[in-house]
Amino acid sequence: MSEFEKIVRDIVFDSPPEEISLVYDNLQVLSDGQSKQQIASIIQEFNEKHRVPAAKGEERYLVSEYNKSGSKYFDPVNKVLFAVDHITREASDIEEYTSEDATQVQSDLYDELSKYVSNFFPDTAVFNVFKIPESDQYAIIVVSNKKSLGDFWTGYWLSEYVYDVDGDTISGEVSVDAHYFEDGNVRFKSTASLESAQTDSPIVSIKQFENEFEKNLINKFQYMNETQFKGLRRRLPVTRAKINWGQGIGNYRLGRDAAQGA
C-alpha cells in the first residue's frame, strides 16, 4: 500500500458516514484530481463496511459484502439487482434478481425485523436480512441515517447482528455516529457489542439489547452535557467567544433518532 493510499484510507475511514461526498470533493482538490479511481475504490470499501443505503427514487437498498454480486448488489427480499455510484450513493441499472430465493428463516426474520423497525425507527430507516454464504447464519442489519449540512449536523445509526440457526445464538454490535459542527466541531461516537447469547427470538433479543443501549447512551450524553461540554465554554482564548454547547448539543437527538433531526 502506497503512502498516499494509506493517508486517503485513514481520512475516509475516520469520516462521518454522511459526509463522504464532501470528503471525496476535498480529496480530489488535494490530489489535483489525479487519483479519482483510487479514492472511489476506497470509498466503496467504506460504504460496504458501513452498510450505507443506496437510493433510487423512494426505494433504498443496503450495500454490503453479503449482497455483492460481481460489480452489482442484490436485494433478496425485493428481488432486484442494482449498481451503485459510491460517491453519490445512487442506485441504478436495476433489474430482476432471480439467482436465489430467500429461505423461510430469512423471510421470517425479515418480517419480524420489519415490525420492529416500523415501531422504533424513523420511516427512513433501511434494513434487511442476508444469508451468509456457506453457513447456516444470517446477517441482520438496520441503518438509520440523515443529514442536514445547512443546519450543521449529520447522524448515523448502524446495528448489525449474526443469527446462528444451528446454535440458536445471536451476536452483534450497534453504533451511533453523530456530528454537530455549528460554531464548533463535536463528534459523538458510541458502540456496544452483544456477545453471543442463546435466543428463542432473535428480533426480541435485538430489541431488548438496543433499548438498553439507547438508555445508556442518553444517560452518558446528559452527563457529558452537564460536565465536559460546559467546560468548553471557558477554553476559547483566541476568539474570546463562548459557544453555548449545553443548549446546542442538548437539542441534538441521539439513539434511534440520531438520523431523524429535531
Swiss-Prot record:
The keyword Membrane does not apply. InterPro entries: CapZ_alpha, CapZ_alpha/beta, CapZ_alpha/beta_2, CapZ_alpha_1, F-actin_cap_asu_CS. It comes from the Eukaryota. GO terms for cellular component: actin cortical patch; F-actin capping protein complex. Gene3D superfamilies: F-actin capping protein, alpha subunit (3.30.1140.60), F-actin capping protein, beta subunit (3.90.1150.210). The keyword Transport does not apply. One of its GO terms (biological process) is actin cytoskeleton organization. Keywords: Actin capping, Actin-binding. GO terms for molecular function: actin filament binding. Belongs to the F-actin-capping protein alpha subunit family. Heterodimer of an alpha and a beta subunit. F-actin-capping proteins bind in a Ca(2+)-independent manner to the fast growing ends of actin filaments (barbed end) thereby blocking the exchange of subunits at these ends. Unlike other capping proteins (such as gelsolin and severin), these proteins do not sever actin filaments. This is F-actin-capping protein subunit alpha. It comes from Kluyveromyces lactis (strain ATCC 8585 / CBS 2359 / DSM 70799 / NBRC 1267 / NRRL Y-1140 / WM37) (Yeast). The lineage of its organism: Eukaryota, Fungi, Dikarya, Ascomycota, Saccharomycotina.
